Regions:
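Detector for outer-membrane/organellar transmembrane beta-barrel domains
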Residues: 218, 223-337
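N-terminal periplasmic/intermembrane-space "pro-region" immediately following the signal or transit peptide
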Residues: 18-66
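Outer membrane beta-barrel
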Residues: 50-73, 77-199, 226-232
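Positively charged n-region of N-terminal signal peptides that target proteins for export
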Residues: 1-4
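Hydrophobic h-region of N-terminal signal peptides that target proteins for export
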Residues: 9-17
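Solvent-exposed loop/turn segments connecting transmembrane beta-strands
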Residues: 77-82, 110-119, 169-174, 213-217, ...
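Membrane-embedded beta-strand positions of outer-membrane beta-barrel proteins
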Residues: 63-65, 104, 141, 179, ...
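Sequence/structural signature of outer-membrane beta-barrel proteins
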Residues: 68-76, 107-115, 144-150, 160-163, ...
């Protein structure tokens, strides 16, 4: 019995001694930490948010892909079916500072051959930089989308199933400069000057008659208004301008887009018009065989969208288009609808 009591006493004494050693080590470690804190240099003063540069503001990269399975049946021809990659675009954009911004967008399924006038590939949609002069004025320069107006024109190509003939035949990514004035958050006015085309005159029109010569300043001048009215109930994308296509030949374009914007229902109506002294859109019946003058184009596009739930969008779109000039039988009427 005495041996058992002696063993228990020795065990308790050993535990107490070990606890004391551990406590001494903890106290010594705390003292060393306090000493390091006392001798460490004071942190540098930095104003609130100073030096904070979120990467998502400087650099954003996107890959956009749109594909389809197309089943087509032309009159008096067999039905065809195919998978088709409509869009494959790589985009980088961001704000370098609060004032300086940039954007680059390139199509990966289009030719990289350089154009003969602006020396850039048509696959490059956008390559521009901008500078915010203040909270109302902005300057932008580089290759950009022309600011014609219209909601179909303004939509992301990823959300387009089929363009109208008017937009399908336009070249609207041009090298140039733009000044923007936004008096408030509901209105924006743009004045833009760009090249009239990507390629030289002869590459588009070929050998022309001696009475037609290339413009000395082949430029496009566009004025555009983007507006939100009645607490964003009505939206506008209106634009118009002049294209100096050749010496003495000017083309006038007008594109008016108006949209009714309700919480679950939206509908827009676009009217697009081109009076071309020298045919540039080139989709009258004779445009592919002769040099057409005084061509007139009109396009009407109506699109309605409904979202019964946030994850579902139901749409229907209709269009009516005309193209003509004074040549005999040189008139086209087109109609279409999508849903």
């Amino acid at each position: 019995m005495k041996k058992i009591l002696l063993a228990v006493s020795l065990l308790i004494g050993g535990i107490a001694s070990a606890q004391q050693d551990l406590q001494n080590q903890i106290n010594q470690l705390r003292a060393e930490i306090d000493q390091l804190k006392a001798t460490a240099p004071a942190p540098l003063f930095m104003p609130e948010n100073e030096g904070e540069q979120p990467i998502h503001k400087k650099f954003n990269m996107y890959f956009n892909f749109q594909g389809s399975f197309d089943v087509e049946k032309a009159k008096d021809q067999d039905m065809t079916a195919k998978f088709y990659a409509r869009q494959l675009r790589w985009e980088v954009r961001g704000d370098i500072t609060d004032r300086i911004f940039y954007r680059f967008r390139h199509r990966l399924n289009k030719s990289n051959a350089r154009a003969s006038l602006d020396n850039l590939a048509k696959a490059t949609d956008m390559l521009y930089a901008g500078f915010r002069l203040d909270d109302k004025w902005t300057l932008t320069a580089g290759k950009m989308c022309q600011a014609w107006g219209g909601f179909e024109f303004d939509l992301n190509p990823m959300n387009i199933y089929e363009y109208s003939d008017f937009l399908e035949n336009m070249d609207n990514f041009m090298l140039g400069a733009m000044i923007t004035y936004a008096p408030n958050e509901n209105h924006e006015f743009n004045f833009q000057i760009t090249d009239v085309r990507n390629d030289k005159f002869a590459d588009i029109y070929g050998t022309t008659s001696p009475t037609i010569s290339e413009s000395k300043a082949p430029l496009t001048y566009i004025f555009n208004w983007n507006g939100n009215l009645f607490d964003n109930l009505i939206q506008t994308r209106w634009g118009g301008g002049l294209q100096s296509e050749a010496d003495g030949y000017n083309n006038w374009l007008l594109m008016l887009g108006t949209k009714l914007n309700l919480p679950k229902f939206q509908v827009f109506f676009d009217y697009m018009m081109a009076n071309e002294q020298l045919d540039r859109l080139k989709y009258t019946p004779m445009s592919s065989t002769v040099l057409v003058k005084d061509a007139k184009y009109n396009s009407f596009v109506l699109k309605a969208e409904y979202q019964p739930i946030p994850q579902l969008n139901i749409f229907a779109q209709g269009l009516y288009e005309t193209a003509k000039n004074d040549l005999t039988d040189n008139k086209m009427i087109g109609m279409g609808y999508f849903a």
